Each structure stands twice: as C-alpha cells, then as structure tokens.
Amino acid sequence: MKKFLKLTTVVVSMVMALTFVSCANGNENGQLNLVGTYGLSKVEVESISKDSNGEESITMTTTMPTSTSIRQYGTQKYIDGETTTDMEMDVTITKTEGGYSFNWAKYNIDGVAQGDDAKTKQQEQFDDDTWKEYTAPFAMTYTTTADGTWNDNSNPASSGTYTVDEATSKVTMTTLIDGGNTLETPVKEELSYSNNGKTLVFVEEESSVDGTYKMTMTLTRK
C-alpha cells in the first residue's frame, strides 16, 4: 500500500486483512464481501499551494476508462495579487501505435475556449515517461483473502493483514512487508468501504503554512 500511495502522487502533474466474511465468492443478497482483487479506478486531488508569487489551487480527477486511455478533468486557479486566472479542462489521452491522441472535451481559460495552439502546448508536455507515471497506479492490484491477509502484484510484492469494522464501515490495512522488505514498524492505513465491499476509498490529507493537499483514491473490486 505504501508503494501504491507513492505512485499516485504523480497523477496530477500534467497541469502545470480483514476478519473472515461469510460471502467469500460473491456479493449475493447484498452481503458484505471484502475478499477479492481490487484495482484503482479513480484518483481525485484537491490542493492549495502558496508562496511569495501567489496562490494556486487545483481540483483534478484522473481515471483510466480503458487499458489504453486516461481521462483527466478539473480546474486550476492561480491568484497573483489582484489577478486571477481560471483554467478548466477535460481531456482523454489515448495511446496509439504512433504515439498519443488527445480528445479535448473542454479547455477554457477565464471562461474562453482555447484553440489548437494552446492545446498543442499542453500536448507537447506529454511523453512516454508521463504515460508511465499516469498509468502505473492503475496497473497495481490488491488481493485480499478470507484468512485476513492481503498482497499486491508488485515485484517484489508488498503484503500484510487487514481487519474490518462493520460498525464504522472501515477497513484497516496493515503493511508488514513493503516491496519484499520486512518492516520493523508495521504501517497501518484506514479505508472506507461501500457497496457491500465492492468499493474501497482511501483519503490522504496534509496541511501546512504552504497550503493543503487532499487525495482521494477509489479502488474497485474486479
């Protein structure tokens, strides 16, 4: 899980163990089922950064609707003194045989739709390394078992245990081995579950004098 969290922090860079459950093989009759393989389906980032030059706020969502495409949509606001610049975007990027194609549903600055020149400048920042950074988190999976353990699909793998609290709809995942290395101090992370266990949500928040940061990751059982 620690490795997964590190990977997801790059997703917005373009702009600028459980107890045993009774229903281990399905989700019939609305029973709670937290056994299976989960993969990332959505990353949402809300951040505000401040420095001597001004303040920037970003609200951005990244999804991977197909194995060869990612979608990024949201807003960016920059405040410099009395000047405020607002950007809105919604773009789907598809990996093709010869590179990448861009389908812009929206690219507005201060409410004005941008032309091909502005879009091209954004597209020129995108390369194979950027694609790998964006898609790597979506390739990771987490498999939970009925005996209260989990492991991911990295090599070397991370693994640990998990417990569930049905009263609060929370799952606590404990990392015992991180990338093949046994941790002296296990790391615990809390996730919320919904849809009878089909969806897991992890929220990470940070706050300092330089701004705030919140990342919400949605994992869906395959």
Listing of model-derived features with the role each one plays in the protein:
Residues 1-10:
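Bacterial N-terminal signal peptides that target proteins for export
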Residues 11-15:
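Repetitive helical segments and hydrophobic/amphipathic motifs
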Residues 18-22:
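C-terminal motif of bacterial Sec signal peptides marking the signal peptidase cleavage site
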Residues 24-40:
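N-terminal helix-cap/turn-to-beta initiation motif at the start of protein domains
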Residues 37-82, 95:
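Post-signal-peptide N-terminal segment of Sec-exported extracytoplasmic proteins
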Residues 214-222:
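Short, low-complexity, Pro/Ser/Thr/Gly-rich segments in the mature regions of secreted, periplasmic
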